[in-house]
């Protein structure tokens, strides 16, 4: 009676476990293809209980009469004013005319969305906190652990690299379709025919920081699938749509960006941001968190960190599952 995820249905826990195994196996396929294929095959074998296939089977936790809870995202949105619509996801959704944008974020009285760029204190003014679009979340909103759309995108990538059966196009479009269903919006058939690219951010688009601009369309992709595209472009499409479907699971989206190099992201406003964590000037995001300073005074094993990491304890040191040929984002 206290199972807040599956309400006592053990079969749904099996689906979650196998879906998590699929996620982990796909994550390592660029580094250990044989290991990835072994566990992808196991996870997708119906005799092992199956994976999450439908919206009804997704793993989520939400407030119930048995155990009232508050969505953990809510305080960052309402109490601290720290969570607002980012210009990266806005550029994709606005460029694609994505109907999920209105399901996920608030707009002003004229129907306009007000995003914030990856910028400095100019974007942290009280006006920005008040006027920028907010995530649509309340105390009763579920916290999603793993959704059906993510499983479809995982299967699409596995099929693309011949690690599992299935048609990459069909699985990609299935992932987009499930994401629309998860967010309660229609129009997926038209969306899958869109050939437009994400918006380039110009100074006129951002009311709370008019000094920022970034060209995001160069080398980018549209939602429409093309069988004639290279596998690299197909991967970019899969991960870009997966990024949109993962919202608000920011950690998983960050992980996929680090692993694959997709989707392309808006650059930091401060062009030396990455240098400060030991990286190259043209990089976009950190690769990892550093260990807490206290660890160096209390943990005798910290001397082994450079060898285990393959680099120093810096934010720019790549983790082991990052692909060797990860593309660099065009300038």
Identify the role of each PLM range.
Residues 180, 184-331:
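C-terminal functional modules
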Residues 1-187, 228-233:
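Structured, solvent-exposed acidic/aromatic patches
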